[in-house]
């Protein structure tokens, strides 16, 4: 059987609120965002820094719900600083037949790291942030065109 490592969870364009070099390691994520993304404490994630291009792997620590906390801990604080925009990505190994139909949890946040929208399309660019879709230079489909997915109605 073939297994593929697929995108499972994505928190898009979160703002790093704190960085603590002297912590033992990890990323602290607001519990509400963790639940929306389907991330668990201790789960491995990649953190992609939009501000400076750094990429790293670490594990998740649950932060206070609805706090907007995104905190970089330990050695990663050398690479990612408060104020940086990041994408937090979780993956899952899936059998090929499951991977073909799996839809990830894509979480969009505002500048305060509060959940503003959820989706399943990893190429989606949320309206109002000045981005284009990841798979085309075409404009985003309207919200009414996207209404078929109940997770988009946030």
Curated annotation (Swiss-Prot):
Substrate binds at residues 58, 74-76. GO terms for biological process: alanine biosynthetic process; pantothenate biosynthetic process. Gene3D superfamilies: 2.40.40.20. It is found in: Cytoplasm. Residues 129-154 are annotated as: Disordered. GO terms for molecular function: aspartate 1-decarboxylase activity. It is an enzyme of class 4 (lyase). InterPro entries: Asp_de-COase-like_dom_sf, Asp_decarbox. Keywords: Autocatalytic cleavage, Cytoplasm, Decarboxylase, Lyase, Pantothenate biosynthesis, Pyruvate, Schiff base, Zymogen. Is synthesized initially as an inactive proenzyme, which is activated by self-cleavage at a specific serine bond to produce a beta-subunit with a hydroxyl group at its C-terminus and an alpha-subunit with a pyruvoyl group at its N-terminus. GO terms for cellular component: cytosol. Its EC number is 4.1.1.11. The keyword Cytoplasm applies. It comes from the Bacteria. The keyword Lyase applies. Pfam families: Asp_decarbox. It catalyses: L-aspartate + H(+) = beta-alanine + CO2. Its main location: cytoplasm. Belongs to the PanD family. This is Aspartate 1-decarboxylase 1. It comes from Frankia casuarinae (strain DSM 45818 / CECT 9043 / HFP020203 / CcI3).
């Amino acid at each position: 059987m073939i297994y593929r490592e697929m995108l499972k969870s994505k928190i898009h364009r979160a703002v790093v609120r704190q960085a603590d070099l002297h912590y033992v390691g990890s990323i602290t994520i607001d519990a509400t965002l963790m639940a929306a993304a389907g991330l668990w404490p201790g789960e491995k994630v990649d953190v992609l820094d939009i501000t400076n291009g750094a990429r790293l792997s670490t594990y998740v620590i649950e932060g206070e719900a609805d706090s907007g906390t995104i905190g970089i801990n330990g050695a990663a604080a050398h690479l990612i600083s408060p104020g940086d925009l990041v994408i937090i990505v979780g993956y899952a190994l899936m059998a090929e037949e499951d991977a073909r139909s799996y839809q990830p949890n894509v979480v969009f946040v505002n500048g305060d790291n509060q959940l503003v929208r959820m989706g399943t399309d990893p190429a989606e660019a949320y309206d109002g942030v000045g981005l284009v879709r990841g798979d085309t230079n075409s404009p985003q489909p309207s919200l009414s065109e996207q209404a078929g997915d109940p997770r988009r109605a946030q």
